[in-house]
Amino acid sequence: MPPHCQPHCVLLLLSTFLSLGLGLEFTGSEGQWARYLRWDASTRSDLSFQFKTAISDALVLYFDDGGYCDFLLLSIEDAKLKLRFSVDCAETTITSDKMVNDSHWHFATISRHNLRTVLALDGDSKVDEVRPQRQFMKIVSDLYLGGVPQDIRTSALTLPAAKEMPPFKGIITDLGYGNKVPTRLGSQKVRLEMEGFCTENPCENGGSCSMADGEAYCDCSKTGYTGRYCNEAVNKTPGFAHMVKSPQAREENVATFRGSEYFCYDLSQNPIQSSSDEITLSFKTWQRNGLILHTGKSADYVNLALKDGAVSLVINLGSGAFEAIVEPVNGKFNDNAWHDIKVTRNLRQHSGIGHAMVNKLHCLVTISVDGILTTTGYTQEDYTMLGSDDFFYVGGSPSTADLPGSPVSNNFMGCLKEVVYKNNDIRLELSRLARIADPKMKLQGDIVFKCENVPTLDPISFETAESFLGLPKWNTKRVGSISFDFRTSEPNGLILFTQGKPQDKKDSRSQRSNKVDFFAVELLDGHLYLLLDMGSGTIKVKATQNKVNDGVWHHVDIQRDGRSGIISVNSRRTPFTASGENEILDLEGNLYLGGLPDNRADLILPTELWTAMLNYGYVGCIRDLFIDGRSKDIRQIAEAQNVGGIKSSCSKVTAKQCDSNSCKNNGICKEGWNRFICDCTGTGYWDRTCEREASILSYDGSMYMKVVMPTIIHTEAEDVSLRFMSQRAFGLLMAATSRESADTLRLELDSGRVKLIVNLGKGPETLYAGQKVNDNDWHSVRVTRRGKNIKLMVDDDVAEGQMNGDHTRLEFSNVETGILTERRFASTAPSNFIGHLQGLKFNGLLYIDMCKNGDIEFCELNARFGMRSIVADPVTFKTKGSYLGLATLQAYSTMHLFFQFKTTSGDGFILFNSGDGNDFIAVELVKGYIHYVFNLGNGPSLLKGNSDSPLNDNQWHNVVITRDASNTHTLKVDAKSVSQVVNGAKNLDLKGDLFVAGLGPNMYQNLPKLVVPREGFQGCLASMDLNGRLPDLINDALFRSGQIERGCEGPSTTCQEDSCANMGVCIQQWENFTCDCSMTSYSGTQCNDPGATYIFGKGGGLIMYTWPNNERPSTRTDRLAVGFSTTIKDGILVRIDSAPRLGDYIMLHIEEGKVCVTFNIGTVDISVKEMTTEVNDGKYHVVRFTRNGGNATLQVDNWPINEHFPSGNSDIERFQMANKKIPFKYTRPVEDWLHEKDRQLTIFNTQATISIGGNDRKRPYQGQLSGLYYNGLKVLNMAAEGHTNIKINGSVRLVGDVPTSRSPSRTTTSMPPEMSTTFIETTTTLSTTTTRKQRSPPTIQTTDDIVSSAECSSDDEDLEECDGGHTGGELVIPVLVEDPIDIPPISTRVPFIPLPPTLHPVLTIIETTKESLSIATEAGVPCFSDQGRDDCDDDDGDDDDGDGLVISGFGSGEVFDSSLPPTDDEDFYTTFSLVTDKILTTSTYEGGYKALAPKWEEKDFKPKKPSEVGRITAIPPLPDLRSSAASPVRPEPAPKIPAGKMNNREVKPQPDIVLLPLPTSFDMDGTKPKGPYITQPMLRTIPSALPTVPGIRRVPPGASEVIRESSSTTGMVVGIVSAAALCILILLYAMYKYRNRDEGSYQVDETRNYISNSAQNNGTVVKDKQPSTKGASNKRPKDKDKEYYV
């Protein structure tokens, strides 16, 4: 007898039937209820019961927390169960799908699990959860069934509506709290269901049950048995006689099976031999699969099972199996209802074609379920006898998967009743024999002989890829089985994995020698795979043809016997056979379900298991896990292990998860299983929603990061992704390398492309992707390898390939970045990387972030975290005579050069290498701009960097020079690049040494054409990359000369006297300084850019800022500053008011032309006034006001400070001052309050509004306001940005763009120079043009603009009147008259705001029309570079811009195209490309160039209509063309301005220039003339300029006196004629130069002198010799440099 059938002592306690809980019958009467002891559902607990009813609406169950928040209500609404509950006032509802008003029994369960609650009805579960602050439910009341007592106060109910709900009508039974029966405390209008004792009949052998006096009695009269329960036989006969019963004695015996129980009847003593037989039984279960009954072995057996909710029958009588499947019409048989099965087999005569005998005997097999569903068939051939001498298994077996013909591998779970086998000779009542413990019946497990509820094996959901369960060891050696159901929509995931002990531990560092047995099931790309290794090699079996990640349940059944086995997925069977001869699967470790733990030190993962290598955990549902036929309650295991990310239910959310746009920072959202999956590759972020910024590593060529693996890793699949930023064309990004082999997976930069090298030991495979990725921008790289297939993606560029050979395994022990350290097996080593790396992810592991956070210990690192400025191996050349030599530059076919430099010198050689013939390459610095000169045999060519400003600003700059296979040369300086395609020769033949930073003796005299510098480079060079070679400038030098040192300290950046302009305050910081410009009205890093500027027109305007009610400040001190320009005598500039009825205010206004501030802080009006000088002179002034309590100061520009101090200091004097304004009845309360609070009337209370413009006070201001600052608020900036708290009304117009006001307390950040509005007027020096061939045409604005003074001088009709009543007029071009006045050679840019049109004659805007331009062009006006080609053609055949006058200025704030690229020409810093020897010093604000002209008064003629504001050119007089004169202003260059903020050039002094209101020179000596005295020819109808005050005035530093003089008509005509004649001469000269130019190269003026920049930066360590200021100012310009201004 097998050991599994050893006898077990089973005691049947008949009293068990009497312990059944009584059912309750609810009649539906008003006031009915049943009350049970409180159910503790606060955190985790289950409640279950059975019920049946016929009504559609009723209260079933209720409890709460006594009237506060928490409650649980189960009711029937619309014939469906509805669960409504609340935790901490967070409420939700669950409704079942099934109707329950069918008078059938239903089983309901309520499961509480912290915030999650599950409602299960007949096996179908619905789940929901709430998210309150409290994590548990409070329960105070008892549990009420069927209704709520009416005497309970409504206020004591959390849900008072429960009292009004219809009462329940029906029966509720088997109420249980978990495994316990609750105590019933009382009931009303509810009766016990007395028949409940007989529901499970305790009478055996067909006895009938009846109730009397509350007890059950059995009627045994018709059974042939006696005893209380009809269990005592009257007589017994040998053999099977005691089992044969009369037809009337219908036995009804039941047993409960839970997956591990079964019983078997031993047939060895009485074998079965029958030709006809019958099997009957009843079953009730929730389970989908399970063995019901089996007898026989080998090829002679009967198997009855439940398979996927259907009944399966397999009969084999020796020659082949007869199989039948019975399925219900609707639903499944696993519905926890009783179903009856009957199987019969009878001998029948069967005739058919092909049979030798016509009437041959066959067995007719019939199976029926519930007496309705019937399937009939015949067994094969003539085997008619069933012979069995084995066992009769009921409910299961020791190894169900090994039973012959078994379609399932797990045992039955549920109830089996009246299992009977009978044939012609015997009747085996198997259920009864088990219950009475017949000696031949052997029981396995704890079998209960009554039908108990066996809950279904609840599914669990793995919600994250990191969640997993650890199950006990799978004890399988030779045979075993595993079955489960899974459901997911995700394509990848590890479902099962377990392994054995290592067979060999000779080398713990290598996986190769640690061979272990393992078993795994994985989902890969939607297909299911079985992996098995029994010691002789791994097999990988694909078990599906179609993808199974479709979101529906799939059943998997795996059965193994020795080396062979079958995996079945949804009944599709796939056989497999393990390698080798071994038949033992030796497993020792845990069986992991859903994934693997983070700590895998004890795991030896097979390379063939790709999901483990790639860290793909399973996300989805698992249910019905059976191991060797025994169920595993994985829900209970999950709760016991308390694993995060696992939920004890399974439901699919119908809504798309990506609809919520949950992936931040441009992450790509993908649909997962009840989750969204964010692909953060290429975003620079990581984490679940791409919200966590990935760490950045900065590499300077000597830095690296190396992750050393604890063991040698072998993989067949890799996922690698990273981001990088670099200006280098070569360098190692990452490499997986091995210490033991040549295996590698390497990503590197190669000639500006990304190169992937994969070597698996049989030679490298190479892929390229991306183009010109060395652009100092972020690029994302992704590598995917699956076996032999590899894919490389760089941004949107994709390259795919396939590995050659049979090798698919990659061996590596390191992951390296920056520098390749494992070079033993590398044939060539890549260049070291210089740049930034971010987001390196290798097979799911973020190595950079793990290294930073200390999550891995085996990380070698010297690269620096953070986005750091990379300066690699800097070297300082301390003198212009210092230089060194390197080996010849290898750049024959292509070239990629990179270096960084930092200098204060404007000129010098950087690189030079000569070659064969005329070939050479030179990189030089000319006037602060990079020049790249080369000759490939076609003649010299030049590329000039187009930087915004000179580069000798003591800042690091990056230079990239490339030449590709198409002979396209590119020069990139910082972020700006220029390119040129050169035809002809493509190879660069270089020989000799590469000179760095200078040339050797006597080499400057023999330089090629277009090479300019005649001296060496003085400054710092770093990060030199010569076509992938990273030289050490010191150690690799072939020779050196002069003072050369490592490192680069550079000039200091400490605060100097002139660090901040316009009285800005210099703030010293650790490595730099910043300027506080808050009280200057200026902005920018040096306080020399204008602030936000508004023009208030004659109609009056108002800008109103209102504080939010809850943010109104009260201050003891105030600071106010604003710049303005006006001619009015009275008006309010700014007024700050307190809340209504308080009366506090501060008002800045003009009275009688003088600035005054009046304020009141609760006493009397206090005024501070500038009494000496009027400010309504049309000039730009800055007024500063400060208050501290009652003390106040007022200062205009840098004039003397006006101060005010209170006359009284005591509280009484202050109160007496305030008493004059306090009503009599409030005097005493106020006095008491003042004494109590010790408040001395120094607080400006509850400030509510800031009013600008005075229009609300009937004292409108007219003019310009700029850079208003008040207590940290830049109100005008805020207005320009459209702040929500600011309202603008009336005639108010914004001028141009403004700096941001987002950081009102900091004014140290300025816009780029091209966005500055500092330059007001522009000056143009008329000179010849030297053009250079083969340059790209400049991108310029092509509007057709010309001066037309006969129209309105502004486009704002609200600001001025325009009357065209006057006719006539003439175009005036004032001729500049040289004046020998001593003028300082340095001036600064001046902020300007156009003045209102109603003032006295001051500078204003000249406008143009397209028509006027056409007239001018036809009249032969010189062409300007900002005109289009259609209207501007100099007919010289080249694409230069001509040599016309360019007159430009600043005007009305009209928005123009700002995309005009500035040139890098030595003397020309505007958008007119490659034009030399011109000076156009201007603001490129918004790309618009505007000019200024006098404003006509009423007595003069006025234009008729407005036109567009445009650019201005000078033309000869035209008939009937009305005109006006423009007063030019030339800003003076600034002395010693910190790096990069101004054009640091020496500008020749030009006399007769009008300087607008406030210059920004900071020469503190006010006795020196601050600029030239100006004469300006005007129209005779315009009066003289405003007179100036005699004597020496207190003027701002650097200010210029403006003197306007009337000119006669004769002088004006002379000027016009002179200008016209000069223009014609210039045009002829330009045509001559063009016709005689050198066709093979650019024209070069060899006689030009390149003067070093004299405006050095603050604190430079090495400075050029400064030219004499005095000499420069006294020298008269030559006649050929006459200048014309409009």
UniProtKB/Swiss-Prot annotation:
One of its GO terms (molecular function) is metal ion binding. Residues 24-198, 254-451, 458-650, 696-859, 876-1048, 1092-1292 form the Laminin G-like domain. The keyword Disulfide bond applies. It holds the Pfam family Laminin_G_2. Residues 1336-1346 have a biased composition (Polar residues). Residues 1-23 form the signal peptide. Residues 1676-1686 have a biased composition (Basic and acidic residues). It comes from the Eukaryota. GO terms for biological process: angiogenesis; cell adhesion. PROSITE patterns: EGF_3, LAM_G_DOMAIN. Belongs to the neurexin family. This is Neurexin-3b. It comes from Danio rerio. The lineage of its organism: Eukaryota, Metazoa, Chordata, Craniata, Vertebrata.
